[in-house]
């Protein structure tokens, strides 16, 4: 039986869990003002945490699709870095259910050693008594590119027809370290190019969010200001690091970019996240099947 471990950053089940969640992230108790701001951001979502909502539904959808032919049993387990169930919990559950091989999958189409990428290595190190198959850099797959391109084109077309348009693709910035950054930046830029070519978008750029001084740039909001000065008056943002929004991406490429565009009096549309959409789940299931060949 194949067990798929589906990894995401964390999934607080209640607003009451947020302090412990961030204590786990930063390794200490956050200062009260910082924790107050973080908690307020979660309240501003006006929904439960997006990862908390999407990740279990994605697991359920993949398990349903992959078991449709009835040839072999597939189980999908959620695993998180900073909340339960943790990686060890997911591995234990897979063992208890009798899985004989594991496949690791993250919310990140782009492999990042400092992000979801470490999950693949962690599972491979901890599980030595059965095969572990990592699904990395799945952004390269035609079906994945197609579903992103469909969303980018819909957002692009929704801008005013006469606008001079540009698509700004985003991922989380990193501290500048050329050797460490190189594969991340190369994958990001390649993904942006593939999606733009499929969507028929002539003007696009790979930019960054959530950065600090000395991190990879340009920042997406700075890019909007620069490009507005250069004559663009319609912008689409599209996050490529994760198929589901987290709190940072939810606000930074949505609300925050919208505010900049309103200030500059230019048009703005955010490309939809993949989430647990039908085409998204079919595309991911297809890539799992391709990686696992005819065993499924």
Language-model regions, residue ranges each:
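Active-site-proximal alpha-helix that buttresses catalytic centers in soluble enzyme cores
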Residues: 1-296
